[in-house]
Protein backbone atom coordinates (compact mmCIF):
# COMPACT_ATOMS: atom_id res chain seq x y z
CA UNK A 1 0.00 0.00 0.00
CA UNK A 2 0.69 3.60 0.61
CA UNK A 3 3.32 3.00 3.29
CA UNK A 4 5.61 0.82 1.18
CA UNK A 5 8.54 2.23 -0.74
CA UNK A 6 7.40 2.56 -4.36
CA UNK A 7 10.54 0.92 -5.72
CA UNK A 8 10.38 -1.99 -3.28
CA UNK A 9 13.59 -0.97 -1.54
CA UNK A 10 14.07 -1.55 2.16
CA UNK A 11 15.21 0.98 4.74
CA UNK A 12 18.69 -0.54 4.79
CA UNK A 13 19.02 0.28 1.08
CA UNK A 14 17.81 3.88 1.24
CA UNK A 15 19.00 5.19 4.60
CA UNK A 16 22.58 6.36 5.13
CA UNK A 17 24.43 3.54 6.95
CA UNK A 18 24.89 5.50 10.19
CA UNK A 19 21.18 6.39 10.30
CA UNK A 20 20.17 2.80 9.63
CA UNK A 21 22.51 1.68 12.43
CA UNK A 22 20.67 4.04 14.81
CA UNK A 23 17.27 2.77 13.58
CA UNK A 24 17.94 -0.92 14.21
CA UNK A 25 18.17 -0.92 18.04
CA UNK A 26 15.18 1.42 18.38
CA UNK A 27 13.12 -0.70 16.01
CA UNK A 28 14.08 -3.89 17.87
CA UNK A 29 13.36 -2.33 21.26
CA UNK A 30 9.99 -0.82 20.47
CA UNK A 31 8.54 -2.49 17.37
CA UNK A 32 10.07 -5.91 17.82
CA UNK A 33 10.56 -8.56 15.17
CA UNK A 34 7.99 -7.19 12.67
CA UNK A 35 10.09 -6.97 9.53
CA UNK A 36 7.39 -5.45 7.28
CA UNK A 37 8.21 -1.98 8.63
CA UNK A 38 11.66 -2.22 7.01
CA UNK A 39 9.96 -2.05 3.61
CA UNK A 40 8.09 1.15 4.45
CA UNK A 41 8.87 4.70 3.47
CA UNK A 42 10.97 6.40 6.16
CA UNK A 43 8.18 8.81 7.16
CA UNK A 44 5.76 5.96 7.94
CA UNK A 45 8.36 3.81 9.70
CA UNK A 46 9.35 6.82 11.83
CA UNK A 47 5.73 7.60 12.73
CA UNK A 48 5.00 4.05 13.90
CA UNK A 49 8.28 3.82 15.81
CA UNK A 50 7.59 7.13 17.55
CA UNK A 51 4.01 6.24 18.49
CA UNK A 52 4.92 2.78 19.80
CA UNK A 53 7.94 4.11 21.73
CA UNK A 54 5.84 6.75 23.46
CA UNK A 55 3.14 4.24 24.33
CA UNK A 56 5.65 1.70 25.67
CA UNK A 57 7.27 4.41 27.81
CA UNK A 58 3.89 5.25 29.35
CA UNK A 59 3.10 8.43 27.43
CA UNK A 60 -0.37 9.05 26.10
CA UNK A 61 -0.57 10.92 22.82
CA UNK A 62 -4.24 11.85 23.04
CA UNK A 63 -6.86 12.63 25.62
CA UNK A 64 -4.62 13.72 28.48
CA UNK A 65 -4.12 17.49 28.47
CA UNK A 66 -6.96 18.69 26.29
CA UNK A 67 -9.83 17.48 28.52
CA UNK A 68 -8.25 19.36 31.43
CA UNK A 69 -7.91 22.53 29.34
CA UNK A 70 -11.54 22.28 28.24
CA UNK A 71 -12.72 21.70 31.82
CA UNK A 72 -10.78 24.73 33.08
CA UNK A 73 -12.11 26.84 30.20
CA UNK A 74 -15.71 25.84 31.00
CA UNK A 75 -15.15 26.53 34.69
CA UNK A 76 -13.83 30.00 33.81
CA UNK A 77 -16.63 30.50 31.25
CA UNK A 78 -14.15 30.83 28.40
CA UNK A 79 -14.84 29.58 24.89
CA UNK A 80 -12.05 27.48 23.42
CA UNK A 81 -10.87 28.59 20.00
CA UNK A 82 -9.14 25.93 17.92
CA UNK A 83 -7.15 27.01 14.87
CA UNK A 84 -7.57 24.71 11.91
CA UNK A 85 -6.36 24.67 8.34
CA UNK A 86 -8.39 22.58 5.95
CA UNK A 87 -6.77 21.02 2.93
CA UNK A 88 -9.23 19.80 0.33
CA UNK A 89 -7.66 17.48 -2.19
CA UNK A 90 -9.40 17.30 -5.54
CA UNK A 91 -9.67 13.78 -6.95
CA UNK A 92 -8.31 12.09 -3.81
CA UNK A 93 -7.93 8.66 -5.46
CA UNK A 94 -5.69 10.13 -8.13
CA UNK A 95 -3.72 12.01 -5.48
CA UNK A 96 -3.23 8.86 -3.41
CA UNK A 97 -2.09 6.93 -6.48
CA UNK A 98 0.40 9.69 -7.34
CA UNK A 99 1.62 9.91 -3.74
CA UNK A 100 2.04 6.14 -3.56
CA UNK A 101 4.35 6.13 -6.59
CA UNK A 102 6.19 9.40 -6.00
CA UNK A 103 9.56 9.80 -4.33
CA UNK A 104 9.49 11.62 -0.99
CA UNK A 105 12.20 13.69 0.62
CA UNK A 106 11.61 12.13 4.04
CA UNK A 107 15.10 11.41 5.39
CA UNK A 108 15.11 14.58 7.52
CA UNK A 109 11.81 13.54 9.11
CA UNK A 110 13.20 10.08 9.80
CA UNK A 111 16.51 11.40 11.18
CA UNK A 112 14.83 13.94 13.47
CA UNK A 113 12.43 11.30 14.78
CA UNK A 114 15.34 8.97 15.54
CA UNK A 115 17.20 11.85 17.22
CA UNK A 116 14.17 12.72 19.30
CA UNK A 117 13.73 9.14 20.46
CA UNK A 118 17.43 8.79 21.28
CA UNK A 119 17.71 12.04 23.20
CA UNK A 120 14.28 13.01 24.38
CA UNK A 121 12.27 10.14 25.84
CA UNK A 122 13.61 10.65 29.35
CA UNK A 123 13.35 14.43 29.05
CA UNK A 124 9.69 14.19 28.00
CA UNK A 125 8.72 13.27 31.55
CA UNK A 126 10.77 16.14 32.98
CA UNK A 127 9.20 18.51 30.44
CA UNK A 128 5.70 17.24 31.26
CA UNK A 129 6.30 17.90 34.95
CA UNK A 130 7.65 21.38 34.18
CA UNK A 131 4.58 22.08 32.05
CA UNK A 132 2.28 20.84 34.83
CA UNK A 133 3.73 23.30 37.34
CA UNK A 134 4.26 26.16 34.89
CA UNK A 135 8.07 26.15 34.98
CA UNK A 136 8.58 28.16 31.79
CA UNK A 137 12.34 28.52 32.30
CA UNK A 138 12.79 24.75 32.41
CA UNK A 139 10.53 24.28 29.40
CA UNK A 140 12.67 26.69 27.38
CA UNK A 141 15.82 24.93 28.52
CA UNK A 142 14.44 21.52 27.54
CA UNK A 143 13.11 22.35 24.07
CA UNK A 144 12.70 19.12 22.08
CA UNK A 145 13.96 18.24 18.62
CA UNK A 146 11.14 19.28 16.27
CA UNK A 147 10.48 16.15 14.26
CA UNK A 148 6.79 16.95 13.71
CA UNK A 149 7.41 19.98 11.47
CA UNK A 150 9.92 18.03 9.39
CA UNK A 151 7.43 15.19 8.91
CA UNK A 152 4.50 17.47 8.06
CA UNK A 153 6.74 19.22 5.53
CA UNK A 154 7.38 15.90 3.77
CA UNK A 155 3.71 15.54 2.94
CA UNK A 156 3.00 19.19 2.23
CA UNK A 157 6.11 19.55 0.05
CA UNK A 158 5.43 16.36 -1.90
CA UNK A 159 5.04 16.93 -5.62
CA UNK A 160 1.45 15.68 -5.54
CA UNK A 161 0.58 18.49 -3.10
CA UNK A 162 2.63 21.10 -4.96
CA UNK A 163 0.88 20.17 -8.23
CA UNK A 164 -2.45 20.82 -6.51
CA UNK A 165 -1.44 24.27 -5.30
CA UNK A 166 -0.71 23.53 -1.64
CA UNK A 167 2.46 25.56 -1.46
CA UNK A 168 1.57 27.94 1.34
CA UNK A 169 0.72 25.64 4.25
CA UNK A 170 3.15 27.19 6.80
CA UNK A 171 1.71 30.65 6.13
CA UNK A 172 -1.86 29.33 6.27
CA UNK A 173 -1.13 27.55 9.55
CA UNK A 174 0.40 30.70 11.06
CA UNK A 175 -2.51 32.83 9.84
CA UNK A 176 -5.05 30.42 11.33
CA UNK A 177 -3.23 30.39 14.65
CA UNK A 178 -2.99 34.19 14.82
CA UNK A 179 -6.66 34.57 13.84
CA UNK A 180 -7.64 32.12 16.60
CA UNK A 181 -5.55 34.03 19.14
CA UNK A 182 -7.17 37.32 18.12
CA UNK A 183 -10.66 35.77 18.32
CA UNK A 184 -9.96 34.27 21.73
CA UNK A 185 -8.58 37.54 23.08
CA UNK A 186 -11.50 39.55 21.70
CA UNK A 187 -14.03 37.14 23.14
CA UNK A 188 -12.42 36.31 26.48
CA UNK A 189 -10.62 39.44 27.67
In which residue ranges do the predicted regions lie?
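A cross-kingdom marker for long, charged
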Residues: 155-156, 160-189
Amino acid sequence: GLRKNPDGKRLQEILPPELYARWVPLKERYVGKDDDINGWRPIFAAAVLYEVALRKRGFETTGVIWPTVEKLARKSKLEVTEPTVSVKVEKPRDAIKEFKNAPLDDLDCFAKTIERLESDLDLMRVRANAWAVGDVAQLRQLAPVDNASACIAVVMNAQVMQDRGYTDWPARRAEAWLAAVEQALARNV
